[in-house]
Amino acid sequence: MVEFYFDIETHSPSEKPNVAQDKIITIQYRELSPDGNPRGDLQILTEWDCGSEKALLETFAKVFLTENTWDFVPVGFNLYGFDLLSLLLRFNHHFGTSHGLSWFYDKPVLDIKPVLVIMGRCFKGCGDPFGKQSPNPIRGWYESGETGRQQNIDYIVRESNRFISILQSLKWDIPRLREGLQKVVVT
């Protein structure tokens, strides 16, 4: 099983994001060791470097859609609620596929959002540790063209580093939690 930090950024022309229509403008991923340490560099695929959203998706498909579902296990935050759903819908849009949510049933995924919700005992604010800004500045940077590209990249790198730090902490703490749960089950 090869875990990869995984995230996307999208451009929404309207005030609120629309996962069914918003264009994917970046896909970023980084291989992780079993304890969450980065292996290799953060890969940032951008719509502007690839030439189009469709070309971006074609490039990522070579890494993501292999014959072995364990070759790329996405690890991230809110993957089922946003990133993977957006990816699925944009693949359907560009390639005429009709994949439903069942497309991901056999795909191993580690989404840490439920863990952070349980830890904070609420949904509101569970993504705060990643430094998400509200309103999201990605839209403005993207719309400013070439001048905003480096700001997008810097934001992505910071968010990736924060996520990896949180993941490493969780991977350290969860075995201790498991020991505590085993004591509860035994008694």
Regions found by a protein language model. Give the residues of each.
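Conserved RNase H-like, two-metal-ion catalytic cores of nucleic-acid enzymes
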Residues: 1-66
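Metal-dependent phosphoesterase core characteristic of DEDDh/y 3'-5' exonuclease domains
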Residues: 23-28, 39-40, 71-187
